């Protein structure tokens, strides 16, 4: 979405994004990053994309306010493309009246022009959030369609029974589990080759949900 070439390359090279973010933000080698520092980076990698404030990061990562402020500033200094993308979403929301996912699904954004501060800031957060989470949802729906079609062809009787966030559960006979695993990995990892970012899928097999 932000077309951050460095971040895309890191994903495609299987680099631990949270560790690298921590190393860059704290200005230390990756091998010296502690679990606590990685946790802070993980909070910021996810939270800042969804409009997390300095106060929110401070509370979520158990940091002092000024530390959280410095971390966010360093993060956006390192990830200029992400800052430009998020700022651009607000401009689009105000000027065009909508934002959209990578695949073109739109959300109207009339409240970004509201004179009510609370209403306006909530709408701004939604405008920055929707294209990201919405694209994730689009990818998941596309993957489910592809998985369902392929299961019908290759594993008759297997069926999707639950979808939660970025995962799906397929119910099948025990002797079908290996082929179902292949279908899931192939179809979910290959759901959107046009985006240029490698999608990695892990598959687990169990007799019930608790074993997965």
Predicted regions: what is each one?
Residues 1-212:
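Conserved catalytic core of nucleotide polymerization and phosphodiester-bond processing enzymes
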């Amino acid at each position: 979405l932000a077309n951050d070439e460095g971040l895309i390359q890191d994903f495609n090279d299987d680099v631990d994004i949270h560790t690298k973010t921590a190393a860059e933000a704290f200005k230390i080698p990756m091998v010296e990053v502690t679990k606590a520092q990685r946790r802070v980076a993980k909070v910021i990698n996810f939270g800042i994309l969804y409009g997390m404030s300095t106060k929110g990061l401070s509370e979520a990562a158990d940091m002092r306010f000024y530390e959280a402020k410095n971390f966010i500033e360093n993060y956006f200094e390192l990830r200029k493309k992400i800052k430009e993308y998020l700022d651009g979403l607000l401009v689009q929301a105000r000027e065009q009246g909508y934002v959209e996912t990578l695949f073109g699904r739109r959300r109207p954004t009339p409240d970004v022009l509201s004179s009510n501060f609370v209403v306006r800031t909530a709408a701004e957060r939604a405008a920055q959030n929707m294209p990201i989470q919405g694209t994730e949802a689009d990818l998941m729906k596309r993957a489910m369609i592809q998985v369902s079609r392929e299961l019908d062809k290759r594993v008759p009787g297997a069926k999707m029974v639950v979808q939660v966030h970025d995962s799906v559960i397929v119910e099948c006979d025990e002797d079908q589990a290996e082929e179902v695993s292949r279908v899931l990995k192939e179809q979910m990892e290959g759901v959107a080759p046009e985006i240029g970012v490698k999608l990695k899928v892990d598959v687990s097999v169990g007799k019930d949900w608790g074993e997965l």
